[in-house]
Amino acid sequence: MNSASACCWWRLALPIADELEESLIWKLTELGISRIAVQHVPEKAERTLLAWLPSSEWSESDRDQLMVNLRPLAEPFGLQLANPTWCEVADEDWSLNWKQHWQSDPVGQRLLILPAWLDLPQEYADRLVVRMDPGSAFGTGSHPSTRLCLEALEKNPPLGLRVADLGCGSGVLGFAALGFGARQVLAADTDSQAVCASRANAELNQLDLDRFRVVHGSVDALSAQLQGEVVDLLLCNILAPVIEALASSFDQLLSANGRCLLSGLLVDQAPRLQVVLEALGWRVNSLTVQGCWGLLDVSKR
């Protein structure tokens, strides 16, 4: 490419519905693309996914193939991806300016997700602030499934409860739970990078290591951390098939009056998951919906 020395990157700008954000970020990361940002206006349903690709490594045919790989991710939602916009940009466009695409994000009536480098906007001064570094691309609260959990925590605060967060990602649910009154959060994720991101974000929020603990693994890792004790509330914002596969082991983590907030499921997956949970002895208290996504509030019978 003749302009490679002057223009070091291809920048992809792709308008997306909010339902697609985490799936597309996951796919880009899986393909080895780590320079990612999401530009959006808080509480709006559409945003722009941005990605920077080395121009010397991504020919036109490679970029076309990338879109071929991304388009199927929209199909389960009954959506189609918009046409991408590609432009060549200099190196400093990524290294210096990517943070400008992230903004403070109010959630519910009381919570504010604030990128770590931004000052607290005066209009949100009375909100509970959770500071996050979104550079890890593990979710910062903008996805509907995450917002459903955050809003459920606000609606029914876990005052004095011990909470477990299975599939914690960036740690945002656990931080919010502590802000809403939980006495301790034990978190786990099978992705070691997510564990590192959670620990880094815990430091940003100046959390005591005993109040927020995160380990690599799944249910067994949480159980080992508990050392025979139990939690009062389990947060689980992961895909419905994974919830279904793990549901039989939730009982070992929870107290007799324990509850689970199960998100990450599409609304049309909820009926099957409800049947599975009821067969395992759980009572489904409610289904909350946001767009195509649902959250099940379940408890022991």
Swiss-Prot record:
Keyword Methyltransferase: yes
Gene Ontology biological process terms in this record: methylation
Pfam families, alphabetized: PrmA (PF06325)
Localization (cell): Cytoplasm
Record keyword S-adenosyl-L-methionine present: yes
InterPro entries linked to this entry: Ribosomal_L11_MeTrfase_PrmA, Ribosomal_PrmA_MeTrfase, SAM-dependent_MTases_sf
Binding site for S-adenosyl-L-methionine: 146, 167, 189, 237
Main localization (coarse): cytoplasm
Its EC number(s): 2.1.1.-
Annotated GO CC locations: cytoplasm
Alphabetic keyword roster: Cytoplasm, Methyltransferase, S-adenosyl-L-methionine, Transferase
Catalytic activity, as annotated: L-lysyl-[protein] + 3 S-adenosyl-L-methionine = N(6),N(6),N(6)-trimethyl-L-lysyl-[protein] + 3 S-adenosyl-L-homocysteine + 3 H(+)
Group of enzyme by EC: transferase
One of the record's GO molecular function terms: protein-lysine N-methyltransferase activity
Function field: Methylates ribosomal protein L11.
Family of this protein: Belongs to the methyltransferase superfamily. PrmA family.
Protein name as catalogued: Ribosomal protein L11 methyltransferase
Organism: Prochlorococcus marinus (strain MIT 9303)
